[in-house]
Curated annotation (Swiss-Prot):
Function: Binds directly to 16S ribosomal RNA.
Gene Ontology CC annotations of this record: cytosol; small ribosomal subunit
NCBIfam families per record: S20
Gene name as annotated: rpsT
Species per Swiss-Prot/TrEMBL record: Lysinibacillus sphaericus (strain C3-41)
A Pfam match: Ribosomal_S20p
The name this protein goes by in its record: Small ribosomal subunit protein bS20
Protein's UniProt keywords contain Zinc-finger: no
Keywords associated with the record: Ribonucleoprotein, Ribosomal protein, RNA-binding, rRNA-binding
Family: Belongs to the bacterial ribosomal protein bS20 family.
HAMAP family reported in the protein's UniProt record: Ribosomal_bS20
GO molecular function, one term: structural constituent of ribosome
Amino acid sequence: MPNIKSAIKRVKVNEKANIANSQAKSAMRTTVKKAENAVAENAENKQELLQAAFKSLDKAASKGLIHKNAAARKKSRLAKKA
């Protein structure tokens, strides 16, 4: 446990950021899975779900949750399946 005041604050800030990042990553994964399932089942709303997945991947990449190349790769593979 840190003794210095600034180190204590950093621990608190990091914990908050960790929670927020985990939730954002989970939401991103959920939208991507929904899009993949829609493409696999050839659902009517697959285009909307693909757009949502692309948006969430781009947002995660811009926030630094995932690398931009990883986002591009996932988007490319999703588009290829569709």
